[in-house]
A protein has these predicted regions:
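Pore-lining transmembrane helices
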Residues: 1-106, 111-248
Length: 248
Protein backbone atom coordinates (compact mmCIF):
# COMPACT_ATOMS: atom_id res chain seq x y z
CA UNK A 1 0.00 0.00 0.00
CA UNK A 2 1.56 3.28 -1.12
CA UNK A 3 1.26 6.59 0.72
CA UNK A 4 -1.06 8.66 -1.43
CA UNK A 5 -3.91 11.11 -1.21
CA UNK A 6 -6.41 8.28 -1.60
CA UNK A 7 -4.87 6.27 1.24
CA UNK A 8 -4.96 9.36 3.47
CA UNK A 9 -8.64 9.82 2.61
CA UNK A 10 -9.40 6.16 3.34
CA UNK A 11 -7.65 6.20 6.72
CA UNK A 12 -9.26 9.46 7.85
CA UNK A 13 -12.75 8.43 6.76
CA UNK A 14 -12.26 5.25 8.81
CA UNK A 15 -11.27 7.34 11.82
CA UNK A 16 -14.06 9.86 11.28
CA UNK A 17 -16.83 7.30 11.03
CA UNK A 18 -15.44 5.44 14.04
CA UNK A 19 -17.05 8.32 15.96
CA UNK A 20 -20.49 7.14 14.84
CA UNK A 21 -21.34 3.71 13.47
CA UNK A 22 -18.07 1.90 12.85
CA UNK A 23 -16.16 -0.34 15.21
CA UNK A 24 -13.62 -3.11 14.88
CA UNK A 25 -16.15 -5.94 15.02
CA UNK A 26 -18.52 -4.66 12.35
CA UNK A 27 -15.68 -3.75 9.97
CA UNK A 28 -13.68 -6.99 10.12
CA UNK A 29 -16.20 -9.15 8.18
CA UNK A 30 -16.26 -6.59 5.36
CA UNK A 31 -12.47 -6.51 5.17
CA UNK A 32 -12.48 -10.32 5.14
CA UNK A 33 -14.86 -10.25 2.17
CA UNK A 34 -12.56 -7.74 0.49
CA UNK A 35 -9.64 -10.14 1.03
CA UNK A 36 -11.71 -12.99 -0.46
CA UNK A 37 -12.38 -10.86 -3.54
CA UNK A 38 -8.65 -10.26 -3.99
CA UNK A 39 -8.05 -14.01 -3.74
CA UNK A 40 -10.85 -14.64 -6.25
CA UNK A 41 -9.19 -12.22 -8.68
CA UNK A 42 -5.77 -13.78 -8.01
CA UNK A 43 -4.42 -10.34 -7.11
CA UNK A 44 -2.52 -9.00 -4.13
CA UNK A 45 -4.78 -7.64 -1.40
CA UNK A 46 -3.10 -4.23 -1.46
CA UNK A 47 -4.75 -3.63 -4.85
CA UNK A 48 -8.20 -3.70 -3.23
CA UNK A 49 -7.61 -2.72 0.40
CA UNK A 50 -8.46 0.96 -0.20
CA UNK A 51 -11.83 -0.06 -1.66
CA UNK A 52 -12.22 -2.40 1.30
CA UNK A 53 -11.70 0.44 3.77
CA UNK A 54 -14.27 2.58 1.98
CA UNK A 55 -16.65 -0.41 1.83
CA UNK A 56 -16.90 -0.38 5.61
CA UNK A 57 -19.37 2.49 5.18
CA UNK A 58 -21.92 -0.37 5.27
CA UNK A 59 -20.63 -1.70 8.60
CA UNK A 60 -23.93 -0.91 10.39
CA UNK A 61 -25.53 -3.74 8.40
CA UNK A 62 -23.29 -6.16 10.30
CA UNK A 63 -24.29 -4.73 13.67
CA UNK A 64 -27.94 -4.53 12.65
CA UNK A 65 -28.19 -8.23 11.82
CA UNK A 66 -26.34 -9.24 14.97
CA UNK A 67 -28.64 -7.19 17.20
CA UNK A 68 -31.96 -7.68 15.38
CA UNK A 69 -32.15 -11.38 14.51
CA UNK A 70 -34.28 -13.38 16.94
CA UNK A 71 -32.13 -16.50 17.08
CA UNK A 72 -29.18 -17.98 18.94
CA UNK A 73 -25.96 -16.08 19.55
CA UNK A 74 -23.97 -18.34 17.21
CA UNK A 75 -26.45 -17.88 14.35
CA UNK A 76 -26.49 -14.12 14.82
CA UNK A 77 -22.69 -14.03 14.65
CA UNK A 78 -22.73 -16.21 11.52
CA UNK A 79 -25.40 -14.12 9.77
CA UNK A 80 -23.62 -10.85 10.58
CA UNK A 81 -20.27 -12.23 9.40
CA UNK A 82 -21.78 -13.53 6.15
CA UNK A 83 -23.51 -10.26 5.29
CA UNK A 84 -20.29 -8.36 6.01
CA UNK A 85 -18.23 -10.72 3.85
CA UNK A 86 -20.81 -10.39 1.05
CA UNK A 87 -20.55 -6.60 1.19
CA UNK A 88 -16.76 -6.74 1.14
CA UNK A 89 -16.86 -9.07 -1.87
CA UNK A 90 -19.48 -7.27 -3.97
CA UNK A 91 -18.51 -3.60 -3.57
CA UNK A 92 -15.02 -3.94 -5.17
CA UNK A 93 -16.63 -5.66 -8.15
CA UNK A 94 -19.20 -2.88 -8.54
CA UNK A 95 -17.04 0.20 -7.86
CA UNK A 96 -15.14 0.27 -11.21
CA UNK A 97 -18.46 0.33 -13.07
CA UNK A 98 -20.04 3.13 -11.04
CA UNK A 99 -16.99 5.32 -11.75
CA UNK A 100 -18.15 5.58 -15.37
CA UNK A 101 -21.48 7.08 -14.20
CA UNK A 102 -19.95 10.31 -12.94
CA UNK A 103 -16.62 10.38 -14.84
CA UNK A 104 -14.59 11.23 -11.74
CA UNK A 105 -16.72 14.15 -10.54
CA UNK A 106 -17.87 12.21 -7.47
CA UNK A 107 -14.93 11.72 -5.11
CA UNK A 108 -16.94 9.21 -3.05
CA UNK A 109 -17.21 6.60 -5.81
CA UNK A 110 -17.03 3.57 -3.50
CA UNK A 111 -19.75 5.12 -1.34
CA UNK A 112 -21.83 5.55 -4.51
CA UNK A 113 -21.36 1.86 -5.34
CA UNK A 114 -22.09 0.88 -1.74
CA UNK A 115 -25.34 2.82 -1.95
CA UNK A 116 -26.64 0.44 -4.61
CA UNK A 117 -25.62 -2.52 -2.45
CA UNK A 118 -27.39 -0.96 0.55
CA UNK A 119 -30.62 -0.47 -1.44
CA UNK A 120 -30.56 -4.13 -2.51
CA UNK A 121 -29.82 -5.38 1.00
CA UNK A 122 -32.53 -3.29 2.63
CA UNK A 123 -35.06 -4.53 0.07
CA UNK A 124 -34.20 -8.12 0.97
CA UNK A 125 -34.23 -7.47 4.72
CA UNK A 126 -37.60 -5.72 4.55
CA UNK A 127 -38.92 -8.74 2.67
CA UNK A 128 -38.13 -10.71 5.83
CA UNK A 129 -39.77 -8.02 8.03
CA UNK A 130 -36.37 -6.88 9.26
CA UNK A 131 -36.36 -3.11 9.44
CA UNK A 132 -34.80 -0.56 11.75
CA UNK A 133 -36.68 2.37 13.17
CA UNK A 134 -35.22 5.86 13.18
CA UNK A 135 -32.93 6.56 16.12
CA UNK A 136 -31.59 10.00 17.02
CA UNK A 137 -28.81 10.26 19.60
CA UNK A 138 -27.39 13.74 19.17
CA UNK A 139 -25.24 15.93 21.42
CA UNK A 140 -25.95 19.65 21.18
CA UNK A 141 -23.50 22.52 21.30
CA UNK A 142 -19.74 22.96 21.00
CA UNK A 143 -18.05 21.21 23.97
CA UNK A 144 -15.09 23.46 24.95
CA UNK A 145 -12.66 20.59 25.52
CA UNK A 146 -13.48 18.89 22.21
CA UNK A 147 -13.33 22.20 20.35
CA UNK A 148 -9.94 23.01 21.87
CA UNK A 149 -8.56 19.58 21.00
CA UNK A 150 -9.76 19.93 17.41
CA UNK A 151 -8.30 23.40 16.94
CA UNK A 152 -5.02 22.36 18.57
CA UNK A 153 -4.81 19.31 16.33
CA UNK A 154 -5.43 21.43 13.23
CA UNK A 155 -2.71 23.88 14.28
CA UNK A 156 -0.26 21.01 14.76
CA UNK A 157 -1.16 19.55 11.36
CA UNK A 158 -0.66 22.90 9.64
CA UNK A 159 2.65 23.43 11.45
CA UNK A 160 3.81 19.93 10.52
CA UNK A 161 3.00 20.59 6.88
CA UNK A 162 4.88 23.89 7.04
CA UNK A 163 7.98 22.20 8.49
CA UNK A 164 7.89 19.50 5.82
CA UNK A 165 7.78 22.08 3.02
CA UNK A 166 10.61 23.93 1.37
CA UNK A 167 10.12 27.30 -0.34
CA UNK A 168 9.01 25.73 -3.61
CA UNK A 169 6.48 23.46 -1.88
CA UNK A 170 5.03 26.38 0.08
CA UNK A 171 4.15 28.00 -3.25
CA UNK A 172 2.34 24.81 -4.21
CA UNK A 173 -0.21 25.39 -1.45
CA UNK A 174 -1.79 28.07 -3.63
CA UNK A 175 -1.46 25.82 -6.67
CA UNK A 176 -3.67 23.19 -5.03
CA UNK A 177 -6.67 25.50 -5.43
CA UNK A 178 -6.10 25.60 -9.18
CA UNK A 179 -6.80 21.88 -9.54
CA UNK A 180 -10.36 21.01 -10.49
CA UNK A 181 -10.34 18.17 -7.96
CA UNK A 182 -11.78 15.72 -10.47
CA UNK A 183 -10.60 12.18 -9.68
CA UNK A 184 -7.85 11.19 -9.84
CA UNK A 185 -6.53 14.31 -8.06
CA UNK A 186 -3.84 13.06 -5.69
CA UNK A 187 -2.50 16.19 -4.00
CA UNK A 188 0.20 14.20 -2.17
CA UNK A 189 1.62 13.11 -5.53
CA UNK A 190 1.07 16.37 -7.40
CA UNK A 191 2.01 18.96 -4.78
CA UNK A 192 3.79 17.17 -1.95
CA UNK A 193 3.05 16.05 1.59
CA UNK A 194 3.61 19.43 3.27
CA UNK A 195 1.17 21.49 1.16
CA UNK A 196 -1.36 18.66 1.38
CA UNK A 197 -1.21 18.64 5.18
CA UNK A 198 -1.70 22.42 5.22
CA UNK A 199 -4.68 22.13 2.87
CA UNK A 200 -6.15 19.45 5.15
CA UNK A 201 -5.76 21.72 8.19
CA UNK A 202 -7.32 24.68 6.38
CA UNK A 203 -10.29 22.59 5.24
CA UNK A 204 -10.78 21.24 8.75
CA UNK A 205 -10.71 24.74 10.22
CA UNK A 206 -13.17 26.03 7.63
CA UNK A 207 -15.52 23.10 8.27
CA UNK A 208 -15.51 23.63 12.05
CA UNK A 209 -15.84 27.40 11.55
CA UNK A 210 -18.86 26.90 9.30
CA UNK A 211 -20.50 24.61 11.86
CA UNK A 212 -20.02 27.27 14.53
CA UNK A 213 -21.23 30.08 12.25
CA UNK A 214 -24.54 28.41 11.38
CA UNK A 215 -25.19 27.35 14.97
CA UNK A 216 -24.46 23.69 14.38
CA UNK A 217 -23.21 21.12 16.85
CA UNK A 218 -19.79 19.54 17.28
CA UNK A 219 -20.35 15.87 18.06
CA UNK A 220 -19.57 12.42 16.69
CA UNK A 221 -21.38 12.69 13.34
CA UNK A 222 -20.36 16.28 12.58
CA UNK A 223 -16.76 15.76 13.68
CA UNK A 224 -16.72 12.59 11.58
CA UNK A 225 -17.79 14.74 8.65
CA UNK A 226 -15.04 17.26 9.37
CA UNK A 227 -12.42 14.49 9.47
CA UNK A 228 -13.78 13.09 6.20
CA UNK A 229 -13.43 16.52 4.58
CA UNK A 230 -9.86 16.66 5.84
CA UNK A 231 -9.16 13.23 4.38
CA UNK A 232 -10.45 14.20 0.95
CA UNK A 233 -8.52 17.47 1.16
CA UNK A 234 -5.65 15.17 0.17
CA UNK A 235 -7.63 13.87 -2.80
CA UNK A 236 -9.58 16.53 -4.63
CA UNK A 237 -11.09 18.95 -2.10
CA UNK A 238 -9.87 22.49 -1.46
CA UNK A 239 -11.55 25.74 -0.36
CA UNK A 240 -12.10 27.01 -3.89
CA UNK A 241 -14.08 24.04 -5.18
CA UNK A 242 -15.99 23.44 -1.92
CA UNK A 243 -17.12 27.01 -1.20
CA UNK A 244 -19.80 27.18 -3.95
CA UNK A 245 -21.32 23.88 -2.80
CA UNK A 246 -21.42 25.01 0.84
CA UNK A 247 -22.95 28.33 -0.24
CA UNK A 248 -25.62 26.45 -2.19
Amino acid sequence: LTYSGLSVAAILIMGGFALFGKNLLNCLPILFGNWLYARWQRERWNKYIIIGLFSTCLAPFVSFLFVTLDTSFARRVLAAALIGALIGFVVPALAPHTASFHMGYNLFNVGFAAGFVAIALMSVLRGFQLDSGSVMIWQRGFPPLLTGLCLGGLALLFGWGWLLSDEEELRRLGRITRHSGRAVADFVFMDGVGPTFMNMAIMGLLAIGWLWLIGGDLNGPTLGGVITIMGFAAFGMHPKNCAPIVAG
